Curated annotation (Swiss-Prot):
Protein's pathway: Amino-acid biosynthesis; L-leucine biosynthesis; L-leucine from 3-methyl-2-oxobutanoate: step 1/4
Pfam families according to UniProt: HCS_D2, HMGL-like, LeuA_dimer
EC id: 2.3.3.13
Recorded family membership: Belongs to the alpha-IPM synthase/homocitrate synthase family. LeuA type 1 subfamily.
Gene that encodes the chain: leuA
Cofactors that this protein relies on: Mn(2+)
Protein name in UniProt: 2-isopropylmalate synthase
SMART domains per the UniProt record, alphabetical: LeuA_dimer (SM00917)
Residues involved in Mn(2+) binding: 21, 209, 211, 245
Region spans: Regulatory domain: 398-520
Length: 520
């Protein structure tokens, strides 16, 4: 669709909740700095609304929302709040410095939620809607109200709730498929019915928020738009509660690719989607599945002989969008040990990185060290290297050196040197295999109660000298933290990944201690 043909009534507002709903995915917790970096990326790529967090949840969440609100250049910054006065006041405080702030408040509306979670009558919930939306509207001009479990709410009562919320001042009404229960046709009909029956429906923008429990989140989101919704709530890589949310990159590219049947448009710069996907994957340490639509490693790969033949003759035979349209570069072999600093910086810019001078120098030193150990350097190697460098820049615990003795007989032994808060510590330990020895060594150096929930290894690229990328998930006190690290030496990568997750647990504990003290 050309700009001349664009109509405001067909514009779809993109609401990203990666930093709130996405982070609720077990193990996907991000550090304060990672949240700021992701928010900056989302703002730069044209996301209309960034739901930056749940301010009442912890001091760390409040600080992240407040800092993102101060720094945002273009996006509306939203803070989530339950239908509780204290929540709403806290959200209002968090977004008050934003150029454009929003309070997003929600309440359950379905019979099963009212009976077993809320323990309120329908009439009581209507009173809560009026009171809380009014309170939020007195704090900010932009208020979003959500009917939790809308798709399992009787339509007559849902209409009453929507009318009440709009009358109280809601500017956006979100009707989420909270448990991923709906199918596209019924979700489309729900929006059409409500927009037809609610007398003040024209006073608010309607929004979709779909979960992927039945694998229908994106399809339902698009169906909701066809039913009259003009805001889509989604997350990068589709991360989120349970099976996740509608994947933002899939929603955006469906709108951009199928303008012939969906006359809608959005402001998102699609060439930044792949970089955003990699950034969120690195921040959460959640790998993107290889066959993931739009941003997966195999999204533009063709192995079948018939497909390859067609691609060579005309790329459109098997590609409905160009790799470049989502930020995928066609060349993969890029750098070597003779590459200079300027070429390295140029490559980083191509990959979407903007590093400070000290970060650039540190990354270049690590790149040269990697190039001395590995013959061919690929884009994926550089991404892994820089993401690890940025993630480790605030770590309290850092790996200095590691030596492992392993063989077919006898116990395996690891000797490790760590820097902990600037102090050097050295220890050795045995284990049932080299990885176990490495992890036992860390436990001796930094005593902790964290439990190892996940340990995975895969090659970043191909070849026997490929970097190993290791994912580790640790849990402690009900919190799960995941980290990834890459190195040509699998044991070094394993140690770095374990330490990365441990650093996240330490940092999360530090930020949440004031919250616990304040609550007591």
């Amino acid at each position: 669709m050309t700009s001349a043909n664009k109509s405001d009534k067909d514009r779809v507002v993109i609401f990203d909740t990666t930093l709130r709903d996405g982070e609720q995915c077990p193990g996907a917790t991000m550090t304060f700095e990672e949240k700021l970096e992701v928010a900056e990326m989302l703002d730069d790529m044209g996301i209309d609304i960034i739901e930056a967090g749940f301010p009442i949840a912890s001091v760390g969440d409040f600080e992240a929302v407040a800092e993102i609100a101060k720094n945002a250049k273009n996006a509306v910054i939203a803070g989530l709040a339950r239908a509780i006065p204290g929540d709403i006041a806290r959200a209002g405080e968090a977004v008050r410095h934003a150029r454009r702030g929003r309070i997003h408040t929600f309440v359950s509306t379905s019979p099963i939620h009212l009976a077993h979670q809320m323990r309120k009558s329908e009439a009581e919930v209507l009173e809560i809607i009026t009171a809380t939306v009014t309170q939020a509207r007195n704090l900010v001009e932009d208020v979003e109200w959500s009917a939790m479990d809308a798709t399992r709410t009787p339509i007559d009562y849902l209409c009453k709730c929507v009318e009440t919320a709009i009358a109280a001042g809601a500017t956006t009404v979100n009707l989420p498929d909270t448990v991923g229960y709906a199918v596209p046709d019924e979700y489309r009909r729900m929006f059409r019915t409500i927009r037809e029956r609610v007398p003040n429906a024209d006073k608010a923008i309607f929004s979709v928020h779909c979960h992927d429990d039945l694998g229908l989140a994106v399809a339902n989101s698009l169906a909701g738009v066809e039913g009259g919704a003009r805001q889509v709530e989604s997350t990068i890589n589709g991360i989120g509660e349970r099976a996740g949310n509608a994947a933002l990159e899939e929603v955006v590219m469906a709108i951009k690719t199928r303008g012939d049947v969906m006359p809608y448009w959005c402001n998102v710069e699609s060439t930044m989607l792949t970089r955003a996907s990699k950034l969120v994957s690195a921040a959460t340490s959640f790998p993107v599945q290889y066959n993931k639509a739009i941003v997966g490693r195999n999204a533009f790969a063709h192995e079948s002989g018939i497909h390859q033949d067609g691609m060579l003759k005309n790329a459109q035979t098997y590609e409905i969008m160009t790799p470049e349209s989502v930020g995928v570069k066609q060349t993969s072999l890029v750098m070597g040990k003779h590459s200079g600093r300027h070429a390295f910086q140029h490559k980083l810019e191509e990959l979407g990185y903007k590093l400070a001078e000290n970060q650039l120098q540190d990354a270049f030193v690590r790149f040269k060290a990697l190039a001395d150990r590995k013959k061919d350097i690929y884009d994926e190697d550089i991404v892994a290297l820089v993401d690890e460098e940025m993630a480790a820049s605030h770590d309290r615990i850092k790996l200095t050196s590691l030596t492992v003795i392993a063989g077919t007989h006898g116990p395996q032994r690891a000797t490790m040197k760590l820097t902990v808060d600037g102090q050097t510590r050295i220890e050795e330990a045995e284990g049932n295999g080299p990885v176990d020895a490495v992890f036992n060594c860390i436990k001796r150096l930094v005593p902790h109660e964290a439990k190892l929930d996940l340990y995975q290894v895969h090659a970043v690229t191909h070849g026997t000298d490929a970097q190993a990328e290791v994912s580790v998930r640790l849990s402690q006190d009900g919190r799960a933290m995941t980290s990834k690290a890459a190195d040509p030496d699998t044991l070094v990568a394993s140690a770095k990944a374990y330490l990365g997750a441990l650093n996240k647990i330490v940092m999360k504990h530090q930020r949440d201690v004031p919250s616990a003290a304040a609550a007591s």
